[in-house]
Amino acid sequence: MQLLHLAILSPFLFAFIIPFLAKYAKRVHTGWFVLILPVLLFIYFLPMIRMTQSGETLRSVLEWIPSLGINFTVYIDGLGLLFALLITGIGSLVTLYSIFYLSKEKEQLGPFYVYLLMFMGAMLGVVLVDNVMVLYMFWELTSLSSFLLIGYWYKREKSRYGAAKSLLITVSGGLCMLGGFILLYLITDSFSIREMVHQVQLIAGHELFIPAMILILLGAFTKSAQFPFYIWLPDAMEAPTPVSAYLHSATMVKAGIYVIARFSPIFAFSAQWFWIVSLVGLFTMVWGSFHAVKQTDLKSILAFSTVSQLGMIISMLGVSAAALHYGHTEYYTVAAMAAIFHLINHATFKGSLFMAVGIIDHETGTRDIRKLGGLMAIMPITFTISLIGTFSMAGLPPFNGFLSKEMFFTSMLRVTHFDLFNVQTWGVLFPLFAWIGSVFTFIYSMKLLFKTFRGNYQPEQLEKQAHEAPVGMLVPPVILVALAVSLFFFPNILSYSLIEPAMNSIYPTLLDGHEKFHVHISQWHGVTTELLMTAGIVVIGTIGYLSLNKWKGIYKLFPSKLTLNRLYDKLLTMMEKGSYRVTKQYMTGFLRDYLLYIFAGFIILIGGAFAIKGGFSFKTEGMAKIGVYEIILTLVMISATVATVFARSRLTAIIALGVVGYTLALFFVIFRAPDLALTQLVIETISVALFLLCFYHLPKLRLKTKTRTFRMTNFIISLGVGVIVTLLGIASSSQRTKDSIASFFVKHSHDLGGGDNVVNVILVDFRGFDTMFEITVLTIAALGIYSMIKTKVKEEGKSGE
């Protein structure tokens, strides 16, 4: 295992230590120990920027299941490194923030930081592995760990509901994505993303291209909360604020964006990719920003804001597909450039806003915007953080959000000039949707800021006396807003170090024989259409915010009964009721019914498959002749079996069943296997004795009258099982595709096992572990039975078995 693999697995390894630290180092907040790891990982990944800047990549393979082509392959390029730095950098700040947010006296810190480290490791695995099967494994780990984090306050019903909702939706999408990965494997015969990229022409011309693309997009859309799968994200706000700041601003919700960007070289050649990704993203942007305006909970506003911003980034990745048709000029690649830049910007301003909202909740006891107001003088630093964050989110200068929003407008305006995918007619919708979504973004940004910090202070509405947060809680958001300001004045620090290498990863096929991408971001381009669109947003957005009370009645046009949340709840209820009804039909409580299902399934599936494929064919060559003794013993065994079934007392049935076992021992004698014969005799004797001992204490056997249908069903099922098992045995012995392994045991029994008794050597040496674990299972079963017999329950001074 190399250092790269260890870097990804280190959060999981460190998570094992956390419970002990939380238990035995109670004087120190557990977060201080946890903080060390993301900081070290960030420092480890940071120097790799020079490598990706020069166009180099880093690849390391750890074999896992090489026979299936599934290996733990770490591949670091510009895109993966960008996400790794976001995961570890934001993770460090969130961990520092959580130290002051979560009380070591009131909260269970051990589980919280175990879940947080699990999530961090899973996210690193998603963005840094090359094998899609390993990627899927880490993908599902992000869903599992986020479920645990969202449900951290598990005593709250809303927390449990939100956690279950996120798990159900994201895991369903993950299963779809797994199906897409398998389809790609069927096309390319490889699980490696790099090898898939090199077989783009093969994939594009295959009939499974569209199904694979749709399945992978479903996985990405569910994880990145795109319409109509966004409904899990607002309910996930029941998680502690550090979780929201980490998962829902910079990491988990960006996993879908990563997948779309990573698979763009494979799918972006198609018109379907362009339309699906860009339109779903644009519609989600408008839908999320529109619904954010009506929210009254600060975290709900940020949740719908996140939905909108993610849609904005995804729409740009969809539009960037045009570059694969026109070439890698700046005119067509600006959308990808803007998507990457806004990905970074969103992590800064949204992370700071989540932390600011957490501070407000922590220091006032509420997030209800109707109870807040007048906090600007009381919490001036938090106000400054919120001002920079909201203005950047609204796309106003001098903050980084303004630059990426202008680039977003540029990419949408250029769509109208694409002679591609028949966008001439519908191309005008792209900048129109972008502008409408930005207007609502401006309105909810102003609402979040001014409704919270301006107006009248209402101490009677608050659970706590409002005051400024401690310094430790303020440091992480201050760092983030400082980045938001700095990146406006010095954006090209990112251009050359992170954005260009990431674009090289998104467009690897465009660089063959061409020079590298050159990204340069400027604050001023003169009076352009984009600037006029921004001015219009400010004017219309200000009017919309000031007149919000007059037009917010429009939200009543959307009945609560028709919302996606209500639809989700109804579908869940219908599935639960339906599954209960179906289960009630076959879960009768009778063991014979369950055996009937099993045996009927065996007959239909196994018997049907063999019959269709012609598996029931027999060869008589090489078979020994059937002797008189064998015929006699067979008749005795059949007679004893019939007697067992029709016996009128348990004693008779047990004796007849014993005859079957002893007859089998005689077969072993005839076939010259004395050890097996002796073993069978001993086992049969013990079994008969135990049966007699147990049944002696049971009431007398009462023969109940059974219906003809019941008896006929039992007869058909038992006859079918017997016939199929017999046919399978004969067919398998007469249709050997390879030589029998018996000769190997006979030949090497003495040399390798040190014994001449082949059967004993097989049991003790060749399959020694099987024998050992069989004994272990029997021992555990015996202990369980013994404990049941010896355990006595005392009730009212009496004891009973």
From Swiss-Prot:
The keyword Magnesium does not apply. GO terms for molecular function: sodium:proton antiporter activity. InterPro entries: CPA3_Na-H_Antiporter_A, MrpA/MnhA1/PhaAB, MrpA_C/MbhD, MrpA_C/MbhE, ND/Mrp_TM, Proton_antipo_N. The chain crosses the membrane at residues 4-21, 28-50, 80-102, 109-128, 132-154, 166-188, 203-222, 229-251, 266-288, 301-323, 338-360, 372-394, 428-450, 471-493, 526-548, 594-616, 626-647, 654-671, 676-698, 710-732, 772-789. Keywords: Antiport, Cell membrane, Hydrogen ion transport, Ion transport, Membrane, Sodium, Sodium transport, Sporulation, Transmembrane, Transmembrane helix, Transport. Its main location: membrane. GO terms for biological process: sporulation resulting in formation of a cellular spore. It is found in: Cell membrane. It holds the Pfam family MbhD. It is a multi-pass membrane protein. GO terms for cellular component: plasma membrane. It comes from the Bacteria. Mrp-dependent antiport apparently occurs by a secondary, proton motive force-dependent mechanism, but the similarity of several Mrp proteins to membrane-embedded subunits of energy-coupled NADH dehydrogenase complexes raises the possibility that there is a capacity for electron transport that could provide a primary energy coupling option for Mrp functions. Belongs to the CPA3 antiporters (TC 2.A.63) subunit A family. Mrp complex is a Na(+)/H(+) antiporter that is considered to be the major Na(+) excretion system in B.subtilis. Has a major role in Na(+) resistance and a minor role in Na(+)- and K(+)-dependent pH homeostasis as compared to TetB. MrpA may be the actual Na(+)/H(+) antiporter, although the six other Mrp proteins are all required for Na(+)/H(+) antiport activity and Na(+) resistance. MrpA is required for initiation of sporulation when external Na(+) concentration increases. Also transports Li(+) but not K(+), Ca(2+) or Mg(2+). Forms a heterooligomeric complex that consists of seven subunits: MrpA, MrpB, MrpC, MrpD, MrpE, MrpF and MrpG. This is Na(+)/H(+) antiporter subunit A. It comes from Bacillus subtilis (strain 168). The lineage of its organism: Bacteria, Bacillati, Bacillota, Bacilli, Bacillales.
